[in-house]
Curated annotation (Swiss-Prot):
Origin organism lineage: Bacteria, Pseudomonadati, Pseudomonadota, Gammaproteobacteria, Pasteurellales
Broad enzyme group: hydrolase
Cofactor details (free text): Binds 1 divalent metal cation per subunit.
GO MF annotation list: 3'-nucleotidase activity; 5'-nucleotidase activity; exopolyphosphatase activity; metal ion binding; nucleotide binding
EC numbers: 3.1.3.5
Top-level taxon in the UniProt lineage: Bacteria
Pfam families for this protein: SurE (PF01975)
Family membership: Belongs to the SurE nucleotidase family.
A GO CC annotation given for this chain: cytoplasm
Biological source species: Mannheimia succiniciproducens (strain KCTC 0769BP / MBEL55E)
Name used for this protein in its record: 5'-nucleotidase SurE
Primary localisation category: cytoplasm
PANTHER family: 5'-NUCLEOTIDASE SURE, 5'_3'-NUCLEOTIDASE SURE
Length: 246
């Protein structure tokens, strides 16, 4: 199996390096990842400056671009040979609920899906037990790849930040929902000019049983199939009726 591995935390991040090490025990893995942290880059592509992939001593690549850039570049002729699967992660921090809209980790997997490959995104609820998340992914890939992976959607995996033997199981979940984000943080730079920081993610608003939030918070691995079609089909008839009534 040939796996393209990317992320949004950057090539040197601990999560991607641990995952690469474990995946290479049963697959041929090529890393094409950003040269620095590009968290929350979503699916943005770099269109106004050239991409400069750098071939590293270990045979992998880092790119001066976004996670989606990396996957787009890798699968559109930059790499020789056919890839069978795109894996993105391990992200330092969960991508639950509304997080998937902003996540570069999820976006890298979505770009793989867009280019016709089955794709997986994996995130850890912390920064400690990357080995747990890596083991979960390595356990799941043979099962998902042979039977369930659909190139029209991705599998979003979130793993509790606990030892592997404390994982209670795996749950297939829907996305939950976060409350509106908190206000930005205002500070002053040394010159007295105002600067702003986007603060941490808001607390969950919908974390009831059956959501990805609930699963991870209760010690389960959360798996959510995600598709690109964001159409609100339930609203289409009502909207059409409203337009025709005017």
């Amino acid at each position: 199996m040939n796996i393209l591995l990317s992320n949004d935390d950057g090539y040197h991040a601990e999560g991607i390096q641990i995952l690469a090490r474990e995946l290479r025990k049963f697959a041929d893995v090529t890393i094409v990842a950003p040269d620095r942290n590009r968290s929350a880059a979503s699916g943005s592509l770099t269109l106004v400056e050239p991409l400069r992939p750098r071939h590293l001593d270990d045979g992998d690549y880092c790119v001066n671009g976004t996670p989606a850039d990396c996957v787009h570049l890798a699968l559109n002729g930059f790499l020789s040979g056919r890839m069978d699967l795109v894996v993105s992660g391990i992200n330092a921090g969960v991508n639950l609920g509304d997080d998937v809209i902003y996540s570069g980790t999820v976006a890298a997997a979505l770009e793989g899906r867009h280019l016709g490959l089955p794709s997986i995104a994996v995130s850890l609820d912390g920064r400690r037990y990357y080995e747990t998340a890596a083991r979960v992914v390595c356990d799941l890939i043979p099962k998902l790849h042979t039977r369930l992976l659909n190139p029209r959607e991705i599998i979003n995996i979130n793993v509790p930040d606990i030892p592997y033997d404390q994982i209670k199981g795996i749950k297939v979940c829907r996305l939950g929902h976060r409350a509106a984000s908190a206000e930005v943080i205002k500070q002053q730079d040394p010159r007295g000019e105002s600067i702003y920081w986007i603060g941490p993610a808001a607390l969950p608003e919908d974390d009831e049983e059956g959501t990805d939030f609930h699963a991870v918070n209760n010690g389960y691995v959360a798996i959510t199939p995600i598709q690109v079609d964001m159409t609100s089909y339930n609203s289409m008839s009502a909207l059409q009726d409203w337009l025709e009534s005017e």
